[in-house]
Amino acid sequence: MPIGVPRVPFRTPGDRDASWVDILINRLYRERLLFLGQDVDSEISNQLISLMIYLSIEKENKDLYLFINSPGGWVIPGIALYDTMQFVQPDVQTVCLGLAASMGSFLLAGGTITKRLAFPHAMIHQPASSFYEAQAGEFILEAEELLKMRETITRVYVQRTGKSLWVISEDMERDVFMSAAEAQAHGIVDLVAVE
């Protein structure tokens, strides 16, 4: 838990002992404000997925807001989170604060089209694929699966950005850092907040 987040004791009816509740975090969740401020891994992905599903069941016509400041992360938990964003009934508005790199960029692009925003000084980084980093034995065993995941991510970017397959494929072959305005021109976000 972050330093300075207020907590209060709360007793659930029927429980003998009180437990500590994070007031601020619960309040933000009730307002449908979700935060990805770390690498995408199984734990944060599962937390965000469960919150999105719970909040969409609770009120299916009120938008969810996913604030992203992430250096990237694991592919499979990221794709699971992306799929959930597409599945839930409410629109998911994505907002880039600071950095949305690799899987963070993928999730930023996965927000509801016309509701993807980046702050003016945000940096967006397209995912780069570096298959050569794995050891040879692992590479041979996992190459087919890696190629399938790469194709999936590439197709999603093509669909979400409106760019051609060759442009997205070329971008994924090299490190591409973009400003918020460049990300808007590239179709990853729809709006750039004004200063």
Swiss-Prot record:
One of its GO terms (cellular component) is endopeptidase Clp complex. Its EC number is 3.4.21.92. This is ATP-dependent Clp protease proteolytic subunit. GO terms for biological process: protein quality control for misfolded or incompletely synthesized proteins. The active site is at S102 (nucleophile), H125. It catalyses: Hydrolysis of proteins to small peptides in the presence of ATP and magnesium. alpha-casein is the usual test substrate. In the absence of ATP, only oligopeptides shorter than five residues are hydrolyzed (such as succinyl-Leu-Tyr-|-NHMec, and Leu-Tyr-Leu-|-Tyr-Trp, in which cleavage of the -Tyr-|-Leu- and -Tyr-|-Trp bonds also occurs). It is found in: Plastid, Chloroplast stroma. Gene3D superfamilies: 2-enoyl-CoA Hydratase, Chain A, domain 1. Its main location: plastid. Cleaves peptides in various proteins in a process that requires ATP hydrolysis. Has a chymotrypsin-like activity. Plays a major role in the degradation of misfolded proteins. Belongs to the peptidase S14 family. It comes from Phaseolus vulgaris (Kidney bean). Component of the chloroplastic Clp protease core complex. The keyword Plastid applies. The lineage of its organism: Eukaryota, Viridiplantae, Streptophyta, Embryophyta, Tracheophyta. InterPro entries: ClpP, ClpP/crotonase-like_dom_sf, ClpP/TepA, ClpP_Ser_AS. Keywords: Chloroplast, Hydrolase, Plastid, Protease, Serine protease. One of its GO terms (molecular function) is ATP-dependent peptidase activity. Pfam families: CLP_protease. It is an enzyme of class 3 (hydrolase).
